[in-house]
Amino acid sequence: MLAGSNPKSATLVKRKDGSYYIQICVEKKPPKQQDTDKVIGVDLGRTDIAHTSEGDNWNGQQLSRVRDHYSRLRGVLQRKASKGTRSSRRRCRELLQRLSGKERRFQVWVNHRISKAIVSRAKTTNSAIALEDLTGIRKRVNQQPRSKAERRRANSWAFYQLRQFLEYKARVAGVSLILVPPAYTSQTCHRCLHIHPEQGKSYRSGKKFKCGHCGWEGDADLNGANVIALLGAVVNQPRGSGLFCSLAEQSRLRATESPLRTA
């Protein structure tokens, strides 16, 4: 990282657990972004943290188990911290601080691994990266029917941090990163570009996607990643504008036909 760069400053930082690390600020000119007509779509979600149009995915089950473990420990320590002797309460508060640091570092480590793998694949295949604009992703996933535990898991995951890691790693690697609007990405069939004709209904059911128009059937997150890749092609390929027109027309038809069906 320091090779070929110009260090500007260094800061010694003390963690809550008493350990230290050093932050070094360097100045490095990023390489020119590679010209390409290939796009890798990345779908971020609650079941798979990330799923790409290349078929790579990072399942969230193991990560959910780790976060649930931290949550249970936190609950036990919080209960103990509210009663007992003064020294035991202080000890519990110290353990809670250490636990918080471990969970935060775990999330950072996972997001670094995911972002590094995605950018490396894009660099190797001379592709750009497309992902949804994450503004409001936490609100959107929480609108879906889930248990209290599932909502807590989504709220605890650093989606925005993952996007930041992807952005800076892509910039350093000379890989273009494209943000696309999230509307209908999970409901559109990547093969025929159709969405369910009835408002409020979708061809997606959990992890499965079955198109009622062309018959394509497969993993819903893979389908979403492919749609995101197609939307990302708007920037790099002339055919992209046609995709937007297709989705816009279907959206308009659903909006105009809905009152007739309910009349």
Stretch-by-stretch model annotation:
Residues 10:
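A basic, amphipathic helix-loop patch mediating RNA/tRNA/ribosome contacts
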Residues 2-6, 14-263:
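Positively charged, helix-rich recognition surfaces that bind polyanionic ligands
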